[in-house]
């Protein structure tokens, strides 16, 4: 705790953003980080708490409080304040494989658990994490450091999202020879094609992948294991296989008119947009156009918000976002005390842009689609909506959804994007390896373990725990790497 009075002297700062009017004209990142001087002041606000909940990653009230990676937040905040950026970088890299990703896309569980929340605003931990990792790149700390000794063991990682990359990075550091198989044309999985460029610039991903390649990790793209590439080949040629394919099976909505043209899953919409942007800056036309259209986004989560922001940048005439649940309160309820994750209403970047552009919040709460209406060409032209109410079931005690009679409304719609979550991984992958899955189609393991029902096969990330955050995927990848290392070598020295 370099400055005991820091939290009293300095206010929370979170950097700036490019104006709404300017940023919606392109797909560039729009967050402007704090200066190093401002980051040092944020480091001074850290109180080096006796119990630092920011790094705890513990379950409270059924949700995680603090960083799942157990990042050493008080340590590197103090190091930043004292100007020791290199040591701060070393302490950050000890626990987090990819701070350049989490400092851009993580919802900052650490900040929600910060003790400063009790009497004010939290330390800007996410800003400081971003500052540390970018310092590492700017000052030559982030460079290839291949292992000096190889173990002779070969490991295949199926999937190059955050969990697969984290597992590959750790196992390569241990000296194993790692090959990562990716079904798409670019490495990165969810990071590359599931998150829009304005949230995570793809050059940031490629910058890190290039270092991993220099360190000896092999990447094979266009390899769809279980489809155009046999699982049996991997089991024969590698000592261990880690499945890290994500939860890529989107949840559909089965209502009348679903077969109409112009209705897409959000993941397809976002992927096509990013691919066309990277391939040709949209010159190839291989994306789903929203220009001049009334867009309906079904789903109120992060993916739904990304669809709102992407639709705006593609020239949508209007955007409506449906949320089945009631609007969350603006402040914590008494039943949701600190350090629990705050269950409050958040207006994200896409919604902010819609409010500024269209003059209204795009979100409509407690509402769902009853049916879609198509024109004579089979194209969606309208959607029938219905209001919902939530009532507690007297027998189960659970909240049950009911449609409100007479609340039906028809709105014009030209493009529908379904962002209703995911149901697990693609079954052809699990079938190809013969691994057991649970009732939610996640790959089954013993609690707290990563070894599947097949001897050589392990699992990590959303494919293991279900749809979750990038920070959780990184943790899963690191933990799975330890499991593999122990089984191959008899022990592990991985963090």
Model-predicted regions and their roles:
Residues 5-32, 44, 57, 68-80, ...:
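Beta1-alpha1 glycine-rich phosphate/pyrophosphate-binding loop at the start
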Residues 12-34, 42-45, 365, 373, ...:
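C-terminal catalytic lobe of FAD-dependent flavoproteins
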Residues 40-44, 48-56, 62-147, 213, ...:
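Glycine/serine-rich phosphate-binding loop and adjoining beta1-alpha1 elements at the start
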Residues 87, 149, 154-158, 206-255, ...:
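Feature captures the FAD/FMN-dependent oxidoreductase FAD-binding
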Residues 155-157, 178, 295, 457:
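Conserved hydrophobic helix-helix packing surfaces used for dimerization/oligomerization
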Residues 159-162, 299-301, 462:
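Glycine-rich Rossmann-fold phosphate-binding loop(s) that bind the pyrophosphate
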Residues 259-292, 392-467:
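FAD-site-proximal beta/loop scaffold in flavoenzymes
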Residues 304-307, 314, 463-494:
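A conserved FAD-binding loop/helix module that cradles the flavin
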